[in-house]
Curated annotation (Swiss-Prot):
PANTHER family: ACIREDUCTONE DIOXYGENASE. It catalyses: 1,2-dihydroxy-5-(methylsulfanyl)pent-1-en-3-one + O2 = 4-methylsulfanyl-2-oxobutanoate + formate + 2 H(+); 1,2-dihydroxy-5-(methylsulfanyl)pent-1-en-3-one + O2 = 3-(methylsulfanyl)propanoate + CO + formate + 2 H(+). Monomer. Interacts with MMP14. One of its GO terms (cellular component) is nucleus. It comes from Danio rerio (Zebrafish). The keyword Cytoplasm applies. It is found in: Cytoplasm; Nucleus; Cell membrane. It is a peripheral membrane protein. The keyword Iron applies. This is Acireductone dioxygenase. The lineage of its organism: Eukaryota, Metazoa, Chordata, Craniata, Vertebrata.
Length: 181
């Protein structure tokens, strides 16, 4: 995967979550459709992430003051299988989720306004933001490897709220924002 790509998922398949799960025929999702639901993307040069002026500019503009790096691989992440299961549980956060893929590739799945799953393929150089309140999940692809920078506004909050979480104020705000965009 070298091109940023998104599509509606085949939700009926019980196959391995790490597979693409494209419908036949494929139903692509445009960048504009993603932006409509609050998902934004930048393509950066991950080889220079430590000194990248473009990344620094985005961090300053968005207030991303904290960052760390996570490596998701069976040999690098303790309790790998259970972590993958946890990441793949449908959930939301009270804050935006910001991830910058430094190496490898993976998928973010997000719900559209009609509650359909959209799969977003991310790979080296992709920086993606998911808005607070959006239902989503994450999985590696068949490579079983992703190294990502996690960015936060202020101190990191690691709490995920599994669905159903429709009574949360942040979820209500997110849903209301879809009607006004």
């Amino acid at each position: 995967m070298s091109v940023f790509e998104a599509w509606y998922m085949d939700e009926e398949s019980g196959e391995d979550q790490r597979l693409p799960h494209k419908l036949s025929p494929n139903q692509p999702v445009s960048v504009q459709q993603l932006e409509h639901i609050g998902v934004f993307h930048w393509k950066l040069n991950a080889d220079i992430y430590e000194n990248d002026p473009e990344l620094q500019k985005i961090r300053e503009e968005k207030g991303y003051s904290f960052m760390d790096i996570i490596t998701i691989h069976p040999d690098k992440l303790p309790d790998y299988q259970n972590k993958l299961k946890m990441f793949y549980e449908e959930h939301l956060h009270l804050d935006d989720e910001i991830r910058y893929i430094l190496e490898g590739s993976s998928y973010f799945d997000v719900r559209d306004e009609g509650d359909r799953w959209i799969r977003i393929a991310v790979s080296k150089g992709d920086l993606i933001t998911l808005p607070a309140g959006i239902y989503h999940r994450f999985t590696v692809d068949e490579s079983n490897y992703t190294k990502a920078m996690r960015l936060f506004v202020g101190e990191p909050v690691w709490k995920a709220y599994n669905r159903p979480a429709d009574d949360f104020d942040i979820r209500k705000e997110y849903v209301n924002s879809l009607g006004s965009s």
